[in-house]
Regions:
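A conserved helix-loop-strand patch within extracytoplasmic ligand-binding domains
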Residues: 110-153
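Extracytoplasmic small-molecule ligand-binding "clamshell" domains
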Residues: 26-101, 231
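Short loop->beta-strand "edge-of-pocket" segments that line small-molecule binding or catalytic clefts
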Residues: 28-45, 130-148, 181-182
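Short helices/loops that flank or line small-molecule/ion binding pockets
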Residues: 67, 71-88, 157, 169-189
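Extended ligand-binding regions for polar small-molecule ligands
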Residues: 53-57, 124-125, 215-255
């Protein structure tokens, strides 16, 4: 009986310590609820995963990535993020002060890279594009872009002709059949995309780069400011110790060199 009593007392003494350890373990894990990409062919963003993992590690945290069951386009992502319910973080390029309930980090995730799209074209059309020397010559040609994508608004605002009604497969078919002329795509993804599309007689146009101000930040609802502050602190540490720049070069440095960005004709948009 005495042994049972002693064991009970010991358990009561250890219980708070065990509970405290459990709480501290849970506090060291950050659950990030993210949106699954609307294009099911798009792989998970390894750069974003690596950046978030490093940033929270600087704060002594581990990250658990939890993706939504249903895919979301940009419009849906903003809507869900504004509800502060299903997702709690997204990386977006949004007009300044357009969503007062959403707060964002201060450092540009891609260092403006998404504002330098290249063009996917039909291989037979490269000589035609090589002769284009001004944006005015490009504007009458039919560009492809989904209306929910940020490039669509930029192209329309700058007077380009854009078909925004097709899904991704429809766009690539339109290029192949000559119903459209070019498909602006991010430097970060265009090479991988064209590799997948090689059976469709498509290529990366070799001479032109569009450029406009575009900066992606991590956004969350203002109710999640504690999460955002933790992430911001981690990102600033990465910037200070050079790991941010190192990670960017690891993922995009070679792509920038291989795509010869510095030697292309640049058409500046606003």
């Amino acid at each position: 009986m005495m042994k049972l009593y002693n064991f009970s007392v010991l358990w009561l003494l250890l219980l708070p310590l065990a509970f405290t350890s459990f709480v501290h373990a849970n506090e060291a894990i950050v659950n990030l609820h993210l949106a699954s990409p609307s294009n099911t062919d798009t792989p998970r963003n390894h750069y974003i995963h690596a950046l978030l993992t490093l940033a929270f590690a600087e704060q002594g945290k581990q990250v658990d990535f939890i993706y939504s069951i249903r895919p979301m386009n940009k419009k849906r992502v903003v809507e869900e993020l504004s509800k502060a319910s299903s997702i709690n973080l997204a990386w977006l390029s949004l007009p300044a002060n357009s969503y007062p309930d959403l707060h964002h980090t201060s450092l540009s995730i891609y260092q403006g890279l998404h504002g330098k799209p290249l063009l996917i074209i039909n291989k037979n059309q490269q000589p035609r594009f090589a002769e284009i020397s001004t944006s005015a010559q490009l504007k009458p040609l039919i560009a492809l872009q989904k209306q929910s994508w940020s490039d669509y608004d930029v192209l329309i605002r700058n007077g380009f002709t854009v078909n925004g009604e097709l899904d991704y497969k429809g766009m690539t078919r339109a290029l192949e059949t000559g119903l459209a002329d070019y498909f602006p795509r991010s430097v970060s993804a265009i090479a991988a995309e064209v590799t997948k599309l090689q059976h469709q007689n498509l290529m990366i146009e070799q001479t032109i780069m569009l450029q406009y101000p575009s900066h992606y930040y991590f956004y969350t609802h203002k109710q999640n400011d504690a999460l955002l502050m933790e992430l911001e602190a981690g990102l600033l540490k990465l910037q200070k110790n050079g790991k941010f720049a190192q990670l960017y070069q690891q993922f995009f440095g070679e792509k920038e060199r291989d795509l010869a960005l510095s030697s292309r004709k640049v058409f500046h948009l606003n």
